[in-house]
């Protein structure tokens, strides 16, 4: 795509500093919001004259979905999430908001279930869905040439926790090795927490994977 029209923003939001991302097409005037912990992300969109086209979720934990309902109520946009994590949106025990948030989080809206290989587009942006279970059974990553949004699957020199309900360490490591580590080494990795990294760097220095 013409990168001169690409908008990419990272905003650590919420009590756990969850990285919320906006990736948009200036010419189209629309953007995807990825893992909104709060609705503060909407202020950033307005500054860039962008409207949300959809909310994309890498998984269903409460620190990644806290702003979804407010965004959906304001803009009536769909919510993309893997079918194995849909139940997290209505269950504060599963999404852990009973423990990590002042009030339990539930989300209602137009759900679009994603699967391996799906393409989600916004203007010239074309994101491919990779199923990467382990942190949750419905964990996914969103990839386009040059970058990948990985949620809590992979971090800078670390990997996502698997000691929560339905976590699976072996599945997580397998997904990282067979899905993410097959991407070009110079692919930028945008995780759910902490700083960005690159695939090649993690293949060399990440002791967990």
Roles of regions detected by a PLM:
Residues 27-28, 38, 62, 85, ...:
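Short, glycine/acidic-enriched loop or turn micro-motifs at the edges of active sites
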Residues 95-98, 125-209:
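Metallo-beta-lactamase
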Residues 18, 39-40, 62-63, 87, ...:
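Short alpha-helical
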